[in-house]
């Protein structure tokens, strides 16, 4: 049995939509943003926080290393490739993503 690689990198994207469009965007984001990541990343999470007037979405993808992430995201992995309808949904188009090195993990990936 081949052991699955352990992620060392988390790539975090954030975007906000008007609260009344959050359910529609959640479905769109899953279909067009999360599903492609499922095929390439070691794991991916879609998170949502509903507030009074807006909803924030956070997508976290987990990667074995920067090279693996760059094969998916391109030469500059901080650069965002906006989805076709992001401009329609998002209050403001994010300018970049956050890339963090995983220094400890328990449960999902850790021992």
Predicted regions and their residues:
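Basic/polar N-terminal segments that are highly enriched at the extreme N-terminus
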Residues: 1-6, 110-111
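An amphipathic, aromatic/His-enriched active-site/gating alpha helix that lines ligand/cofactor pockets
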Residues: 4, 31-43, 62-99
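A generic structural micro-feature
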Residues: 5-7, 51-53, 91
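Short acidic/polar alpha-helix capping motifs at helix-coil junctions
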Residues: 8-11, 22
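Short, well-ordered beta-strand segments in beta-rich or mixed alpha/beta enzyme
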Residues: 10-16, 45-77
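Short, surface-exposed ligand-recognition loops at beta-strand->loop->(often short) alpha-helix junctions
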Residues: 16-27
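Residue-level signal for secondary-structure boundary sites
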Residues: 21-23, 67-69, 105
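Acidic/histidine-enriched, glycine/proline-rich intrinsically disordered or flexible terminal extensions
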Residues: 100-111
């Amino acid at each position: 049995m081949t052991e699955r690689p352990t992620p060392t990198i988390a790539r975090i994207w954030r975007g906000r939509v008007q609260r009344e469009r959050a359910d529609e965007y959640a479905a769109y984001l899953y279909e067009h943003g999360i599903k492609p990541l499922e095929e390439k990343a070691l794991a991916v999470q879609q998170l949502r926080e509903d507030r009074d007037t807006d909803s924030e979405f956070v997508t976290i993808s987990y990667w074995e290393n920067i090279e693996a992430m760059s094969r998916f995201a391109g030469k500059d992995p901080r650069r965002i490739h906006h989805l076709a309808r992001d401009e329609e949904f998002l209050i403001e188009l994010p300018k970049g993503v956050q890339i963090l090195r995983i220094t400890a993990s328990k449960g999902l990936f850790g021992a």
